[in-house]
Swiss-Prot record:
Name recorded for this polypeptide: Uncharacterized protein YdcA
Signal peptide: 1-20
Keywords: Signal
Top-level taxon: Bacteria
Organism expressing this protein natively: Escherichia coli (strain K12)
Amino acid sequence: MKKLALILFMGTLVSFYADAGRKPCSGSKGGISHCTAGGKFVCNDGSISASKKTCTN
């Protein structure tokens, strides 16, 4: 039972880690600050994201 709980816990941690890389400005960039007029993401560290997604906010 303890092994099953440990495996489920580790699987949850791995899935959270994998999901973090799928969002623009993730990781050390600090998240999304705002959008440019051209639909690019501006990160909290001031850089422009290289994401191919379009920012609509």
